[in-house]
C-alpha cells in the first residue's frame, strides 16, 4: 500500500494568505509570511473578529520566530526542525468585556487549506490524522457569569465532499470534526447536528474521549500527541448525516472525497486562550 501526505506545507514555512474578518471576497487577501517564504498554501481566517490582523506589523519572536498582534489575537510562528504555530485569542477584548448573546455571531481564528487533489474515500485503506498540540490554561473575566453558549473550542474540521461533477449532489459536504478542547467540559462531547454558523451542513464530531482514550480530562499546558486512523469515524459521520436527512442527493460513499481542512479556535465568549501546533499531518493510505 502507498502512503501519501495530503497537506502542502504542513509546517507553515511559507506563511498564510489572510482574509479580512467579515468580507473575505471584498479585497485581495493580505500576505503573512517571513523572509525566504514562498507562495503560501494556507489561508488564515478570522471570521466575525472585531480586529483585523492583516493590518498588524510583523515582529521578531524569539531567536527564530515572527509574530503578528492585534488587541484580540496573536499569531506566532517559530522555525525549527518541527516548526510551531501559535494561535492566541483574547475574548475579553473581542467582546468588549461583555457577554455575547446566544444568537450573535462568534469570533474565529482558523488556518485552512483546500486540498490540491481531493482523495476519494473509496481509494483509502486508512486516513491518518496526526499532530501535536499544547493548549494553555484558559482564563475568563471573573466579573461575568458565563452561560452554556460561552466557550472556546480548539478543533479541526475536514470536509467530506461529493466531488462527482455532473452529479445532482455535486459540492454537498459533511463537516467532520476532531475536537481537542471545549472549555465547558473536561473532554469535548460528541456533536451531530446541522451547522448554525452559516453553511447549513451537517457536523459530525466524535467525542474527545474517542480520540484521547488515555485521558479523563484534557491536560492543559502539556504537549499532547494525536495519531489516529479517522476513516471509520468518517464513515460513521456519513451514516449519521443520511439518517438525519442531510446529503440526500449523495447517498453513496463512493461519491465522497477528502476536500479541505481547517484547524483553530472558535470563541463564543469572553475567554483568553492560546494553543500551539506542530507536526500536523493528514496521510492517505491508499488501497493496493
Model-assigned labels for residue ranges:
Residues 95-101, 140-148, 241-250:
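Low-complexity, polar-biased intrinsically disordered regions enriched in Pro/Ser/Thr/Gly
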Residues 1-3, 7-22, 48-49, 57, ...:
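Disulfide-rich extracellular domains of secreted proteins
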Residues 1-72:
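Extracellular carbohydrate-recognition regions
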Residues 8, 119-129, 148-152, 252-257:
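Solvent-exposed loop and beta-edge segments used for protein-protein assembly and interaction
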Residues 126-128, 132-234:
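Short helix-loop boundary/capping segments
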Residues 69-141:
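Short N-terminal edge-element motif at the start of the domain
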Residues 106-113, 154, 233-239:
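Well-ordered, non-membrane alpha-helical segments in soluble/globular domains
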Residues 208-288:
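Long, compositionally biased interface segments
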Amino acid at each position: 500500500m502507498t502512503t501519501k501526505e495530503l497537506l502542502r506545507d504542513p509546517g507553515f514555512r511559507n506563511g498564510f494568505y489572510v482574509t479580512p474578518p467579515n468580507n473575505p471576497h471584498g479585497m485581495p487577501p493580505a500576505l503573512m509570511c517571513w523572509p525566504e517564504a514562498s507562495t503560501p498554501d494556507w489561508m488564515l481566517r478570522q471570521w466575525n473578529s472585531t480586529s483585523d490582523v492583516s493590518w498588524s506589523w510583523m515582529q521578531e519572536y524569539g531567536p527564530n520566530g515572527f509574530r503578528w498582534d492585534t488587541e484580540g489575537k496573536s499569531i506566532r510562528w517559530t522555525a525549527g526542525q518541527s516548526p510551531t504555530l501559535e494561535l492566541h485569542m483574547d475574548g475579553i477584548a473581542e467582546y468588549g468585556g461583555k457577554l455575547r448573546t446566544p444568537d450573535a455571531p462568534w469570533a474565529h481564528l482558523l488556518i485552512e487549506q483546500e486540498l490540491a487533489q481531493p482523495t476519494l474515500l473509496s481509494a483509502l485503506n486508512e486516513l491518518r490524522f496526526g499532530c501535536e498540540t499544547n493548549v494553555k490554561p484558559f482564563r475568563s473575566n471573573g466579573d461575568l457569569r458565563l452561560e452554556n453558549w460561552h466557550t472556546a473550542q480548539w478543533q479541526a474540521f475536514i470536509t467530506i465532499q461529493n466531488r462527482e461533477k455532473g452529479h445532482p449532489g455535486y459540492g454537498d459536504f459533511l463537516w467532520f470534526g476532531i475536537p481537542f478542547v471545549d472549555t465547558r467540559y473536561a473532554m469535548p462531547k460528541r456533536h451531530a447536528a446541522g451547522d448554525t454558523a452559516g453553511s447549513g451542513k451537517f457536523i459530525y464530531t466524535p467525542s474527545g474521549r474517542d480520540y484521547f482514550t488515555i485521558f479523563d480530562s484534557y491536560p492543559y499546558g502539556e504537549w499532547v500527541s494525536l495519531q489516529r486512523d479517522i476513516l471509520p469515524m468518517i464513515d460513521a459521520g456519513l451514516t449519521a448525516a443520511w439518517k438525519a436527512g442531510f446529503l440526500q442527493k449523495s447517498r453513496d460513499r463512493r461519491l465522497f472525497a477528502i476536500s479541505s481542512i481547517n484547524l483553530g479556535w472558535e470563541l463564543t465568549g469572553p475567554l483568553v486562550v492560546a494553543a500551539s501546533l506542530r507536526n500536523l499531518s493528514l496521510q492517505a493510505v491508499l488501497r493496493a
